[in-house]
Amino acid sequence: MKERLQQLQQEALEKIEQANDLKALNEVRVAYLGKKGPITEVLRGMGALSPEERPVIGALANEVRQAIQSALEAKQAKLEQEEVEKKLAAEAIDVTLPGRPVKRGNHHPLTRVIEEIEDLFIGMGYTIAEGPEVEKDYYNFEALNLPKGHPARDMQDSFYITEEILLRTHTSPVQARTMEKHKGRGPVKIICPGKVYRRDNDDATHSHQFTQIEGLVVDENIRMSDLKGTLREFARKMFGKDREIRFRPSFFPFTEPSVEVDVSCFHCGGHGCSVCKGTGWIEILGAGMVHPNVLEMAGFDSKKYTGFAFGMGPERIAMLKYGIDDIRHFYQNDIRFLQQFHRV
């Protein structure tokens, strides 16, 4: 029995050494230490031994079993390490190979224009205010001097979610909310950039979703001349230092008086061309003095405080600045269009 156990140990150790992979090693494990293996058979046959032989053979069988188990574990660790090394060698990166340059990204032209406008007004002491795109009817209309049934509401077809909730049609609600937060105390000096929504049919100059930037200043002794000076400064920084602006009478329910603002054509210098349609002027935004009703509804004393407001579309500014003839180009994600602005 002793010779048999010693022979089994020697055979098992030799086969463990010869195993070239984990599968072969597992076959050796099952062959020698499995339920039907020779070591197990020896242990089962110990009942036939004499009482004197039984402890000696039992101890030897356990030693042989432990020796084989230890050899299996050592060989398994070695084979696993070899597999890791082979995998690392196969996946090695040759750092001497020339790298692939990362493709250079760029800002969308609308993002460029919006950030440029924001920077201009921040430089003039304005802060950026934001508000919800899903807005209450009150802030979108009533707080801006557009009560229910007002005929001017027909100027904007709106996306209503419920009777009192809609997608905002302009960023003016942000002005109303900001004034309300000030609780009747000035000054207020903000710009409000953001997305707006109207039920327009998409074409070269209209989109159901577009962006607006509106500005608001409320304080004591604010005059029309302050509005004109602000917009002249904006036009010169945005379109060139020689630009002039002009006001044309207009109507907006939330301002009185209201004006359309034109800038002298930056393509022809005001002499007349196809861009300005021969007039020498290009319309860029609407503006006016804040209506007293709007001030009062926001909690301001209209006899003490005055203010001006203006609103522009970054899409129109970008179309004029970069010579883009169709607003839909901004939203189609056409790489041929967008890659033109890498160095703009």
From Swiss-Prot:
It catalyses: tRNA(Phe) + L-phenylalanine + ATP = L-phenylalanyl-tRNA(Phe) + AMP + diphosphate + H(+). Gene3D superfamilies: Bira Bifunctional Protein, Domain 2. One of its GO terms (molecular function) is magnesium ion binding. Keywords: Aminoacyl-tRNA synthetase, ATP-binding, Cytoplasm, Ligase, Magnesium, Metal-binding, Nucleotide-binding, Protein biosynthesis. GO terms for cellular component: cytoplasm. NCBIfam families: pheS. Belongs to the class-II aminoacyl-tRNA synthetase family. Phe-tRNA synthetase alpha subunit type 1 subfamily. This is Phenylalanine--tRNA ligase alpha subunit. It comes from Geobacillus sp. (strain WCH70).
